[in-house]
């Protein structure tokens, strides 16, 4: 199924599929109708292909990574660069992935007739979408950088600035420690929806997807260094936090929070998991380019044995060469 086959509105048909909870989702839906609906949403989006997407974006992508011998193509684009039908497809991928793992509420999706995450107009900076596509055009991985809700940038320690989603969920303030002259909330982005396709066959190619995403994130920060100075979010220790530390970030992490969202928000189940995410924020390190070169050098070995070890070896070299540790960009 191609992206042009995506429904234009309303609910997709339900069918006699395995219930959503059978795939390991949590919490199980409270009604069989919601279960069937959620299962069909997942089934619909696992058949979607986006083969033409790289050639359909408006203008040049912020980042394009291709030709590394693994058949993967990774692009980073601002939301306005995505044609509407592709944007809906990308948001549908997000919905399907997080319904499948139980981090979104299938009852809400069913009641609202959602086949993709709701589209919202950004009051501040546009969302930056990063996608890794297979040779067949399937989305293999995804991550978003979400900007501040402030229409105009405000100082990071301004008492009336808008909160980022992670701050709202954890009821913490993350940014005042990174306040600096000329740095505003429009220089901060939250990392969200970092995910590898849960249905992708595990193997040498799937192992490379998170590295593609991290390389694209880093190159995006380098390309937009005046704009992206601080990142924040929430993550489990073995998730985005681990990846960020590996590439030179020294994030401020707040432990022992009790995150939650109102039960009328689609993502509320994500904060009622056995292992909870921790909120974090950190300045983009000054030696980020070296770490990105290290990832690229590993990925350029294609799927040859030991490519990950080669990349990690380069990381250690970069770290050793930074006598004073990571320095902040645009400090």
Tell what function each PLM region has.
Residues 137-142, 189:
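Glycine-rich phosphate/pyrophosphate-binding loop shared by adenosine-nucleotide-utilizing enzymes
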Residues 1-66, 109-116:
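Acyl-donor-binding surface of acyltransferase catalytic domains
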Residues 144-151:
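Long, hydrophobic, well-ordered secondary-structure blocks that form the structural core
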Residues 238-316:
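Accessory, usually C-terminal, subdomains that scaffold auxiliary metal cofactors
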Residues 20, 24-31, 59-116, 129-139, ...:
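Short amphipathic alpha-helix that is part of the acyltransferase structural core
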Residues 118-131, 151-154:
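A short helix-loop-beta-strand connector motif used in the catalytic cores of GNAT acetyltransferases and
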Residues 154-273:
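Acyl-donor binding region in acyl/amide transferases
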Residues 314-331:
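Charge-patterned, long linear interaction tracts outside catalytic cores
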């Amino acid at each position: 199924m191609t992206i042009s086959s995506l429904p234009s509105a309303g609910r997709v048909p339900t069918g006699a599929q395995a219930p959503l909870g059978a795939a390991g989702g949590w919490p199980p839906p409270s009604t069989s109708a919601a279960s069937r609906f959620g299962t069909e949403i997942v089934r619909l989006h696992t058949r979607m292909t986006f083969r033409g997407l790289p050639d359909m974006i408006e203008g040049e992508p912020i980042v394009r990574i291709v030709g590394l011998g693994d058949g993967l193509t990774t692009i980073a684009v601002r939301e306005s660069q995505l044609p509407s039908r592709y944007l809906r497809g990308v948001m549908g991928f997000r919905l399907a992935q997080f319904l499948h793992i139980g981090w979104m509420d299938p009852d809400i999706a069913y009641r609202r007739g959602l086949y993709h995450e709701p589209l919202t107009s950004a009051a501040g900076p546009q969302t930056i979408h990063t996608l890794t596509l297979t040779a067949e055009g399937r989305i293999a991985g995804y991550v978003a950088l979400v900007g501040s809700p402030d229409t105009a940038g405000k100082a990071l320690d301004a008492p009336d600035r808008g909160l980022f989603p992670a701050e709202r969920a954890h009821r913490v303030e993350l940014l005042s420690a990174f306040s600096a002259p000329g740095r505003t909330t429009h220089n901060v982005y939250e990392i969200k929806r970092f995910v590898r396709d849960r249905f992708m066959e595990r193997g040498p190619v799937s192992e490379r997807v998170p590295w593609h995403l991290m390389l694209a994130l880093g190159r995006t920060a380098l390309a937009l260094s005046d704009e992206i100075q601080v990142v924040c979010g929430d993550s489990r220790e073995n998730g985005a936090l681990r990846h960020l530390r590996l590439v030179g970030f020294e994030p401020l992490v707040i432990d022992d929070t009790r995150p939650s969202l109102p039960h009328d928000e689609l993502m509320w189940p994500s904060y009622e998991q056995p292992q909870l995410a921790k909120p974090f924020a950190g300045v983009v390190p000054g030696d980020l380019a070296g770490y990105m070169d290290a990832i690229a050098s590993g990925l350029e070995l294609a799927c040859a044995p030991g490519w990950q070890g080669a990349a990690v070896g380069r990381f250690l070299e970069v770290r050793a060469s930074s006598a004073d540790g990571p320095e902040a960009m645009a400090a």
